[in-house]
A protein has these predicted regions:
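Conserved alpha-helical substructure of the radical SAM core
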Residues: 1-10
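Active-site beta-strand/loop signature of hydrolases that rely on acidic residues for catalysis
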Residues: 13-14
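Conserved AdoMet/S-adenosylmethionine-binding subsite of the radical SAM
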Residues: 5, 17-157
């Protein structure tokens, strides 16, 4: 704030919550002085009370079977009004799996977004067409990946 910088800071990386008790809380609280703090997480680890005080939003990305890993969702997140959920999907079967996941864990549908798994603009458009109707049927939002539309999978954009 002393530099005149304000806004929204996203703490991301493999899994930021592995740094609980090792500086993450202090970092988040210091960043909070600059504006809103969002933490991206798989949802496996719950935040500490100290971290939760300094975080405005959790961007929770539970893993579906298309990710090739099984990671349990901690019960903190479905009940937190700060948590928003993003599922990476490639087809109707993934949408069905995400909808079942949301239902089974009591995640509010209004806090759920589906994001196309794609690396090129052409693939992105194709995935959007494949998932759209299933998303509507389940009352789930779809968020496009505009950087893929603009630049494909180019780094640094």
């Amino acid at each position: 704030a002393s530099l005149g910088v304000t806004g929204h800071v996203v703490v991301t990386g493999g899994e930021p919550l592995i740094w609980l008790g090792r500086g993450l809380e202090d970092l988040a609280c210091r960043l909070r002085e600059l504006g809103a703090v969002e933490v991206e997480t798989s949802g496996v680890y719950p935040p500490s009370a100290g971290l939760d005080r300094c975080v405005d939003y959790y961007d929770v990305s539970p893993k579906l079977s298309n990710a090739g890993v099984k990671a349990p969702l901690h019960p903190f997140y479905p009940s937190s009004p700060k948590a928003w959920f993003k599922f990476v999907v490639r087809d109707e079967a993934d949408v069905e799996e995400a909808a079942a996941y949301v239902e089974a864990r009591g995640i509010p549908r209004g806090r759920v977004f589906l994001m196309p798994m794609a690396e090129t603009p052409e693939e992105h458009s194709a995935v959007l067409r494949r998932i759209w109707d299933a998303a509507l049927r389940h009352g789930l939002r779809v968020t496009p990946r505009l950087h893929i539309e603009a630049w494909g999978n180019a780094r640094g954009k």
